[in-house]
Amino acid sequence: MAESIGLIERAAALLRQLDANESAPLPPPAGEAGAGHGGPELVLDRGRLASYGITIPSSARSRTVEEFRLVKRNLMTQFSPGDSSTDQRSSRLIMVTSARPGEGKTFISLNLALAFASERDVKALLVDVDTQHSTLQTILGISTEQGIVDVLAGNCELSEVLIQTNILNFMVLPSGRGGPHVPELFSSNKMANLMAEMTRRFADRYIIIDTPPCMASSDAAALAPQRCSR
């Protein structure tokens, strides 16, 4: 319970920081360049992340760092990357949502993904599926307009939109542009196949999914039943 309260406090702090930064946005990250995996590469500004209350693998030990280490360790004792069984692959898909907007789900998603990325033997893939209000893209400074929605719509390949960052073991799949039929895309067989592909292709990763609030959008309900079935 104490861990949960602490995380909620940090989430509230993030929201205050986002509000404060709306009139004076921080400068964007240093830049992007082509990466060997075929998609873009994003150079994250560590100072920018810290200003939003986001911890990075090289952060000094602090209350926030230790809280996310505890959550991460609990998850890792239950689900191990590299296990080829269907149940274990699907269990490494960790969906983070909230009841309403503004409750800190992106704060949790990003910090948890970076906590996994600090491990020596595993990696993290952070997937943004909040197409309506992507706080994640604001924090990371992602400018690309393509993402998972475009993959599902058949407009591009997964490898074209996966973003490799300058933080070791940490990749991002942005949301892409929203639209009236996003819930149908998320509930489709193509989404189930994409999740299965990601868990097979990235067997050494925990896949954190930053999901829209469940009481503000039908997207979360569409995504919840999607499990790795192949």
Across the structure, where does each feature detected by a protein language model lie?
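P-loop NTP-binding module
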Residues: M1-R230
